[in-house]
């Protein structure tokens, strides 16, 4: 009996400790989340008329930059962002506000689509010549185009197993969803978009590692790097981060 009492004492102490840790993380993160507009986004989700949320328009381009915006929505998580202690974010998260499977996703640039057989919600496009550095090949990655039950929102013309299907800039690829694989962590409907480096052998590197990806700022003509980003993003003639000394 004494052992059971001790067990519950330790369990209660652990729960209190865990709650304190969560509270500390939330308190530490609050200014970052506020400044990034997350609370406005949450308010908008509850009542769209309560706040005017700045959004990007699909298929638009900043001046003469090579890429178009691949989807519409609130550009909420930027390149290099860190949220609640997670690792640096390797791309952009663009949250559509119309519901699951509704907001279209388009090819940001001409290329060749591949969808691995096991990919439910993702495709990747090979671009033989980087429009900003033509000597190298790059890839653009699009994911979360499916629902939590595993139903894909990718168009039927790009079935699992598709390899090197030619696509033009602005071609429809699918629709935003909230599929997150086997992760315990639920997500809101959005598109994760990133630019991925080639491995030197004609394939793509692991997109989840930010070191294998490219800052999308100059490709879209906006400051999208978390270290100097405009929030909300806007077209700029100077999308690169200024030197640290001048910030």
Where would I find each of the regions flagged by the language model?
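Acidic, glycine-rich catalytic/binding loops that coordinate metals and/or anionic ligands
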Residues: 137-138, 157-171, 186-247
């Amino acid at each position: 009996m004494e052992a059971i009492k001790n067990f519950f004492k330790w369990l209660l102490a652990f729960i209190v400790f865990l709650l304190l840790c969560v509270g500390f993380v939330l308190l530490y993160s609050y200014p970052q989340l506020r400044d990034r507009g997350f609370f406005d986004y949450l308010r908008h989700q509850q009542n769209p008329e309560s706040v005017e949320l700045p959004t990007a328009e699909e298929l638009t381009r900043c001046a003469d930059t090579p890429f178009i915006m691949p989807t519409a929505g609130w550009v909420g998580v930027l390149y290099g962002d860190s949220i609640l202690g997670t690792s640096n974010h390797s791309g952009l998260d663009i949250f559509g506000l119309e519901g699951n499977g509704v907001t279209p996703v388009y090819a940001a640039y001409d290329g060749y689509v591949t969808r691995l057989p096991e990919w439910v919600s993702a495709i990747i496009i090979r671009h033989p010549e980087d429009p900003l550095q033509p000597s190298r090949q790059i890839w653009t990655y699009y994911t979360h185009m499916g629902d939590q039950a595993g139903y894909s929102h990718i168009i039927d013309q790009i079935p699992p197993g598709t390899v090197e299907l030619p696509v033009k800039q602005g071609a429809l690829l699918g629709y935003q969803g909230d599929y997150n694989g086997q992760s315990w962590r639920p997500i809101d409907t959005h598109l994760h978009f990133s630019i991925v480096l080639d491995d030197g052998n004609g394939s793509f590197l692991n997109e989840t590692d930010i070191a294998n990806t490219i800052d999308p700022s100059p490709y879209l003509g906006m400051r999208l790097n978390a270290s100097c980003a405009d929030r909300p993003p806007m077209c700029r003639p100077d999308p690169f981060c200024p030197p640290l000394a001048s910030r």
